[in-house]
Amino acid sequence: MPGARRRRRGAAMEGKPRAGVALAPGPSGRRPSARCARRRRPGLLLPGLWLLLLARPASCAPDELSPEQHNLSLYSMELVLKKSTGHSAAQVALTETAPGSQHSSPLHVTAPPSATTFDTAFFNQGKQTKSTADPSIFVATYVSVTSKEVAVNDDEMDNFLPDTHWTTPRMVSPIQYITVSPPGLPREALEPMLTPSLPMVSLQDEEVTSGWQNTTRQPAAYAESASHFHTFRSAFRTSEGIVPTPGRNLVLYPTDAYSHLSSRTLPEIVASLTEGVETTLFLSSRSLMPQPLGDGITIPLPSLGEVSQPPEEVWATSADRYTDVTTVLSQSLEETISPRTYPTVTASHAALAFSRTHSPLLSTPLAFASSASPTDVSSNPFLPSDSSKTSELHSNSALPGPVDNTHILSPVSSFRPYTWCAACTVPSPQQVLATSLMEKDVGSGDGAETLCMTVLEESSISLMSSVVADFSEFEEDPQVFNTLFPSRPIVPLSSRSMEISETSVGISAEVDMSSVTTTQVPPAHGRLSVPASLDPTAGSLSVAETQVTPSSVTTAFFSVITSILLDSSFSVIANKNTPSLAVRDPSVFTPYSLVPSVESSLFSDQERSSFSEHKPRGALDFASSFFSTPPLELSGSISSPSEAPASLSLMPSDLSPFTSQSFSPLVETFTLFDSSDLQSSQLSLPSSTNLEFSQLQPSSELPLNTIMLLPSRSEVSPWSSFPSDSLEFVEASTVSLTDSEAHFTSAFIETTSYLESSLISHESAVTALVPPGSESFDILTAGIQATSPLTTVHTTPILTESSLFSTLTPPDDQISALDGHVSVLASFSKAIPTGTVLITDAYLPSGSSFVSEATPFPLPTELTVVGPSLTPTEVPLNTSTEVSTTSTGAATGGPLDSTLMGDAASQSPPESSAAPPLPSLRPVTAFTLEATVDTPTLATAKPPYVCDITVPDAYLITTVLARRAVQEYIITAIKEVLRIHFNRAVELKVYELFTDFTFLVTSGPFVYTAISVINVLINSKLVRDQTPLILSVKPSFLVPESRFQVQTVLQFVPPSVDTGFCNFTQRIEKGLMTALFEVRKHHQGTYNLTVQILNITISSSRVTPRRGPVNIIFAVKSTQGFLNGSEVSELLRNLSVVEFSFYLGYPVLQIAEPFQYPQLNLSQLLKSSWVRTVLLGVMEKQLQNEVFQAEMERKLAQLLSEVSTRRRMWRRATVAAGNSVVQVVNVSRLEGDDNPVQLIYFVEDQDGERLSAVKSSDLINKMDLQRAAIILGYRIQGVIAQPVDRVKRPSPESQSNNLWVIVGVVIPVLVVMVIVVILYWKLCRTDKLDFQPDTVANIQQRQKLQIPSVKGFDFAKQHLGQHNKDDILIIHEPAPLPGPLKDHTTPSENGDVPSPKSKIPSKNVRHRGRVSPSDADSTVSEESSERDAGDKTPGAVNDGRSHRAPQSGPPLPSSGNEQHSSASIFEHVDRISRPPEASRRVPSKIQLIAMQPIPAPPVQRPSPADRVAESNKINKEIQTALRHKSEIEHHRNKIRLRAKRRGHYEFPVVDDLSSGDTKERHRVYRRAQMQIDKILDPTASVPSVFIEPRKSSRIKRSPKPRRKHQVNGCPADAEKDRLITTDSDGTYRRPPGVHNSAYIGCPSDPDLPADVQTPSSVELGRYPALPFPASQYIPPQPSIEEARQTMHSLLDDAFALVAPSSQPASTAGVGPGVPPGLPANSTPSQEERRATQWGSFYSPAQTANNPCSRYEDYGMTPPTGPLPRPGFGPGLLQSTELVPPDPQQPQASAEAPFAARGIYSEEMPSVARPRPVGGTTGSQIQHLTQVGIASRIGAQPVEIPPSRGSQYGGPGWPSYGEDEAGRREATHMLGHQEYSSSPLFQVPRTSGREPSAPSGNLPHRGLQGPGLGYPTSSTEDLQPGHSSASLIKAIREELLRLSQKQSTVQNFHS
């Protein structure tokens, strides 16, 4: 050849650039030129080129070639091997001689194209292999391409493709040896190459020869394997090698390049193609490039990386019209594929520019494109590295996409397969097949991807198909998983695809290099392969078809794939030469998109612009116009070739092995077109094409392969048969057929080969077949070529179809995806049947007869399918249906393909003998159809069994025959037994006849598992007879021990599923593997597990809607050996039934149970740990189930775990949940109703220690009986668990009795304890109770009287938080008494609050205290306060309390008259208080207040003066004690404060107050009482005795601190001290007590002075020693106790009345008067000290300043304190100010009375003490009390100082008295009283209280003024606690009552 040099495949190829081999296209029959070229070119190139040329009769002399190579004659091409300037050192340019000039017949042409397998004379020197200058041409008739593993040796491949490593041989071995059919090849070419291995021969002749040497050497092999073509493709994979596209003498990159997919080789090829697009790329449709691609793809995929580079370089530029189209198509195809996985595929479009004229060449580029697609795939998960290359490739090859798309048939699959292939470029077709099978298993486009990846990773065994279909789904082991989902329609396609996959993979790599590779890749799929190999147009279509085919289901995923493919292919095309071609219908990913892609490709071939238009088309358009338009396009674009490829492509589409078919059809089309030069009109046979497409698509599913085979030629053939267009198609078909075979080889390795052989053998037949095949039928027929093969296919397809088709047909995707596709889908299933029918017809009629029919008729039939092509998609369905039953068709389609494959391989060797191949095909079909593509059926060219029986151990049965047994008879007998049982014909495949009779049983493509056969035989008379002929039957595999076995039970299987078939076993194995994998993902465990099915039995063999249950026994093996069944069971039971059912694919009844359960020690010696449970309702069937015991163990363990978890919820449990182990010892049926069953078991804890029966039963019995029954699933009799040894256990009754005993003992003890506590508490409060005895009557009366007030105060108490009404009252009063009250209050409060008894006593005490002190004090204070306060501030307060004031007034006068006994005074007070208030408490309080208020002092002044003198003495005595006391008190107060804060304060305070002053207080109190009696005589006759006793009792009650105080000085002192202490607290308390603040504010003191002015002056006179305040204070000190008592009483009353503003008013009134007076008059250091000590009491009492200062001490100014009640503060202050001048003086005088009052007040305080107890505000009250007392003391230092009460009495009493006086005498309340009462009290009543309700307010008030503060404090106490309107209301009522009483008393006093 010019510039062609034969190079050694090794160094020569790599080292130097090859000279380009140029085959000058001769006019039409320049066979000689071609030959010459070939001759010139050593066998390597020449044979390939010659084959190509032969394929192209026009180029080669048709004379010679046409007879020889029907295929080659189609085109005679010159292979020009030139250096590609830009791209590769050497490019092979194949020139077409006259296109189509020499189609002896379309069939012939078809055959030659096949033969032209690789006239690849071009080396990809491209980027990757520059050294591949070697002009190695791959020439092989497609027939020659043998699926056999004649795989070109690496060396040979290297020779052929020096640059590319001939990895293909491994993968392609069967395929790569595509023998160019002798007819197709030039004789020279043929000579070098055996007809079967013609390509090899060519290679041999030239460098390529080496590459093809194997092929050549093994012509038989070529013919033999349907995958042959696949292999051939593999060989083609070499970028250098020319893909043997049957149609053209297109130089495909060498198989090696493909195999390697080495970039350089492919690039070189691409370059070659690019340069000699016309020549090089011009693969006739017959050129097997797509098919080679299919095989090649498998190989190229591995070298995909390499391929990546060349794409740009390689241009398939046909000089012919196809050039641009080709490029465009390639691009588009590539793009189509690319869009999905590898957009890079589009890269090669530039390089792959091939003229439309050279469809074959274009086909080659398509192959590259296919490679690109694979590259894209690469970019997909599987070929990431390749993917980048793919990009390049994409750009390079326009059509690679299509091939890829073939792969893409399953959108994912297609890509994946490429990737996969790339990984396993070289895997043998068988491997590919396995992959495809895997893919089948995957059965989904998605799965395909996953599978692909795995395959890619693994080896390129059936990579493409598997990858495409299955790998995407299975990440881990695509192969393993592939079988998992055989049902998916994709599987059949996958299997086809798989083979193509391999090629595709190879191409994929190459695709990276060039689009040709891409094209090839799809062929590898079988479907995809075709598009790749197709010319650009064909490629484009091919892609579309491929996509359709690759889709899981041709039909279903046809739409899906179509879009994918289309997208890929289009994009490739668009990128490449023709933007139009680059239609990239990839964008149209819809099925329509896919179709448009094909159309686009076709159009691109025809017109790039048109292609571009097509691209826009939707997949639907593609689908419908795929046939119609693409053919048209081809025709128009590439006169015929371009369109023909489209048509072919469509046909492949139609077929599930769409790629291969598409490829071959495309190639054929090109061939037809080229050779026939069919014009677009012919191609444009849109209907036929479309129809074809639809049919193909139906075929595509499974049938696709079959159809592809047939359609390749047969489909095209019909078209050829029809008009020239038809003829073109036929020719293309023929080529396609060859291609189909190649494709089949790719998709179904064997099938492809078979078709090739068939075509070669029966070109005419093929042609005939094709037409009859119409679309799918034709294809099938063509594939069948030999009728018998077709028939075989038909049968097989049906079976396969069923399984596969079930998968495939179901796909709605196809239908939904595209109308056409939908139709196709329907058509597919129908088509398959049709194919079957046609096949049958074709088979019987034989190719020629069919040809006659087919061309006109079958084609019409096909036309029926095809004719409606546009509709046809549907029509094909109809046609299919018509031709064959839809079901049959569906079943057949896939199987057919498989069968075709098988046959193809077998037929390929005997080109002439089509029938034998068909049978092979049938098995292949079954294989393809079955997901079992994995079976090496492909490799075997034998019937494609659905399972791989190369390692038949799982299926072999070994029997020992009796001596007398005759083997022939035994075989017959066994067959008969099995036939009867299985209800179908079976065959025995005997492996060994001697010694042991070893055989396996098959039925058609199905293989029966050994165990299913053994189960039949052992129950037959052959074994069971008395004199059995068979002594023993056993499987050939090793059965593990029972402890390793696990049993799973399926509920049922559908009647269509035969559990005896190997595919069912494989599916279950895969499901179990998947389940184990899923479990192991979440549970650490052994990996690399394998499942071995040991037995499968089904209970009911009769055919029913559901056959079951199915028992499956299996073992799991790891690297260390078999796993224990219990371990496997435990592992699998982590899955739910639903999950496990999902993995197995059938509903599961029992997940996994071991045959042997581990048992613990069941010895009788451990019977003590046995527990017994009786279940009810256990049926015998359940009981007999061997799993019953295990289930009960698990449920009991669950029960225990639940108990332990619940226990942990109650308390930390000792038993860990879920770790208990239950071992059932015995399960026995008991007699009785309701089917009782006794379980005897024992429990071990997590540590393996056995629990005793008692402990176990106790633990279990903690569970609720109902819950236990739910868990166990059965009702339980009696107790849940009972120890076996002692069935008698304490009955629930006895247990309950025990409980009662416990309750009877514990509860009484508790009750006693409670009583003791209460008694102790009461005893603690006995002090208060002591007060009660003082005046029982008073108490009772007061209680009665106070009931209302109590109620009111109770209400307030509740709000305040006080426990008792009394407490509340006390609180109120105590609040007024800052210090003493505090002390008393605290105790009393504590007492009262703590216990009701204390409350009552406190009430009584309060009343009594109030009565005596309050009477006396109130009398005095009221009088004084009435005068002072009355004068000062009588108005409002008195008005407000006028009612009470009058009442209290009389008592005051009477008290003024002096009652001899404090009791009388108190009684009087009580009486007074009763009338106004229902409760005495309030009245007494009022009286006390009234007495406290200065009004009383005026009355008392005369006697008080004396008393004052006495009190001064006492005060002097007491002061000393008081000082000490005050210190002590201060300390105690602190303690109390702490206690109080803790809630104990009030009580102790009371105790201190009462106890401290007991004796002295009694003494002083008596004096004061006497004074009070005098004062109170008029109003009340309360015996002072009572008061004193009360006082004493109170004092006794009150803590000894009080006595200590007395010891220190007067009780008042003590209290003052306390108050002082409290004062510190007082600060706090003051705030609570606004009253105190009032006092402090000096309002109360001023008020007192106002009222007491006279008395205070008198008192001052009496106590001149004391400064006005001081002397007052001092004199009162003796009477301070009394005053204190009085104060307490008053405070109590005040607290009771606290709410009433009368007290505040009095306080205010007094305060105001006093403060000024006190400051000026008396601020004795003593007083101040006291004041400081006492806090609010003394300081206020000592001086007005002191009160204020005391507040200041507290840090609060009196007014500030009151600020919370500004009205009060100011009011008090104002009143004070009003009073001040007088008050000071009066105060001095008043102090004496106050001193008396102080005495009273002391009693009052005592009374008050209890009340404070009542108050929850205790602390506040105490503070208030202190503050108030202090202020009062400050106001009236005289008496008040000595005793808190008395001190306070001056001012405080007035204030308190004011409350009473104000109430009793609105005016008489001391001016200050009234005044303060009016502002302070009113405010409290109205808003003051509420506002001051906050404790804060109270304290402030306390600060304001002693008097004011006091009332306020009491009020406040209520308020803070309650601060609610109701509380205020109650307090107001009380105050009203008190004020009324006070006013009365005051009036009386006055």
Curated annotation (Swiss-Prot):
Residues flagged as site, Breakpoint for translocation to form KIAA1549-BRAF fusion protein: P1643, S1644, S1749, R1750
Protein's cellular compartments: Membrane; Cell projection, Cilium
Xref: PANTHER family: SEA DOMAIN-CONTAINING PROTEIN (PTHR21590), UPF0606 PROTEIN KIAA1549 (PTHR21590:SF4)
Family to which this protein belongs: Belongs to the UPF0606 family.
Disease (UniProt): Retinitis pigmentosa 86: A form of retinitis pigmentosa, a retinal dystrophy belonging to the group of pigmentary retinopathies. Retinitis pigmentosa is characterized by retinal pigment deposits visible on fundus examination and primary loss of rod photoreceptor cells followed by secondary loss of cone photoreceptors. Patients typically have night vision blindness and loss of midperipheral visual field. As their condition progresses, they lose their far peripheral visual field and eventually central vision as well. RP86 is an autosomal recessive form. A chromosomal aberration involving KIAA1549 is found in pilocytic astrocytoma. A tandem duplication of 2 Mb at 7q34 leads to the expression of a KIAA1549-BRAF fusion protein with a constitutive kinase activity and inducing cell transformation.
Segments traversing the membrane: 998-1018, 1299-1319
Topology term for the membrane: Multi-pass membrane protein
Residues where Phosphoserine is found: S1388, S1395, S1554, S1555, S1624
Name listed for the protein in its UniProt record: UPF0606 protein KIAA1549
Main subcellular localisation: membrane
Function of the molecule: May play a role in photoreceptor function.
Name of the gene: KIAA1549
Skewed-composition ranges (Polar residues): 378-398, 1454-1463, 1911-1923
Any one GO cellular component localisation term in the record: photoreceptor connecting cilium
Positions bearing Phosphothreonine: T1622
Ranges annotated as biased composition (Basic residues): 1-10
